[in-house]
């Protein structure tokens, strides 16, 4: 079903189901000892989407060269390490506020070794925030930072809601937009980064991943892969969930607003983690995806 401007979801539907899928991939990475996320698998089981529960429980076996749990684990390990390192590097540099936009089932507020006094803000839909908070409490998990939740749609006035939760616009912050931008309309994407800039003190940091052209989700190479995955029970169709059409190139957008941006391709990110990027049609379709970090001013 195509997106609408005011659509809503939980962790089992629409965009929310992609957060559960990502958590399942983190669970595979953790099982392979590539990252350490002890909460990923329990959260996936709590959501209860059958295909992802079976995936984390090892009940789905490789059916094609493109669907390989080990490959999924490596890919998600690269992405997770990128954002983990980003936040920890910022914290070690004295940045005491972290903002995780579209936090989904992200458990960094519970699993990263944050310095004392760090405040971690999680921004996402109310149903998503409530589910994760209650589930982690039931698991006995305790935050390793001061965790503050902002239950709001990023298409609404999330900046005001963030300030109401105590965000300090006079102190630097570290921001992440992980796996987020394709799910925003062009105007909302630009507004997101304009709001981040307006809220950020000099020395603030930002990390994001960017798909230059969402038409990749309609690419025949990806569609063929999607059909094979559907046969295994994966129902998420990214082509229906992402917003298509031209949009600003975020690096240019941010550079014009005072951010110094450093980017690497998805293949370079794999290489930096000791993995070879795959050489098949699906990998080729996403070869232009980039991972970027930025610093404001200075």
From Swiss-Prot:
The keyword Transferase applies. GO terms for molecular function: methyltransferase activity. InterPro entries: Ppm1/Ppm2/Tcmp (IPR007213), SAM-dependent_MTases_sf (IPR029063), SAM_mthyl_Trfase_ML2640-like (IPR011610). The keyword Nucleotide-binding does not apply. Its EC number is 2.1.1.-. Exhibits S-adenosyl-L-methionine-dependent methyltransferase activity. Belongs to the UPF0677 family. PANTHER family: S-ADENOSYL-L-METHIONINE-DEPENDENT METHYLTRANSFERASE YKTD-RELATED (PTHR43619), S-ADENOSYL-L-METHIONINE-DEPENDENT METHYLTRANSFERASES SUPERFAMILY PROTEIN (PTHR43619:SF2). This is Putative S-adenosyl-L-methionine-dependent methyltransferase MAV_0778.
């Amino acid at each position: 079903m195509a997106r609408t401007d005011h659509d809503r979801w939980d962790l089992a539907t629409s965009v929310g189901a992609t957060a559960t899928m990502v958590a399942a991939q983190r669970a595979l990475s953790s099982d392979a000892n590539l990252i350490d996320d002890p909460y990923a698998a329990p959260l996936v089981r709590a959501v209860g989407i059958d295909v992802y529960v079976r995936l984390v429980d090892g009940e789905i076996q490789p059916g094609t060269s493109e669907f390989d749990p080990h490959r999924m684990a490596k890919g998600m390990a690269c992405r997770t390490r990128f954002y983990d390192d980003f936040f920890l590097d910022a914290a070690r540099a004295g940045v005491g506020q972290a903002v995780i936009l579209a936090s989904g089932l992200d458990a960094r507020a519970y699993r990263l070794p944050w310095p004392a006094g760090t405040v971690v803000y999680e921004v996402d839909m109310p149903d998503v925030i409530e589910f994760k908070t209650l589930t982690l409490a039931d698991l006995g998990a305790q935050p390793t930072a001061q965790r503050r939740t902002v239950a709001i749609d990023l298409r609404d006035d999330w900046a005001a809601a963030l300030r109401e939760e105590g965000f300090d616009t006079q102190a630097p912050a570290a921001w992440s937009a992980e796996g987020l931008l394709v799910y925003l309309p062009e105007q909302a994407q630009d507004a997101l980064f304009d709001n981040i800039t307006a809220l950020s003190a000099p020395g603030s940091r930002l990390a994001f991943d960017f798909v230059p052209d969402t038409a990749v989700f309609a690419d025949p190479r990806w569609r063929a892969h999607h059909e094979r995955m559907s046969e295994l029970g994966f129902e998420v169709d990214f082509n229906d969930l992402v917003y298509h059409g031209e949009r600003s190139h975020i690096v240019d957008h941010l550079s014009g607003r005072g951010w110094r941006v450093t980017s690497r391709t998805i293949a370079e990110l794999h290489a930096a983690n000791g993995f070879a990027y795959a050489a098949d049609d699906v990998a080729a379709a996403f070869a232009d995806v980039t991972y970027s970090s930025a610093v404001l001013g200075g």
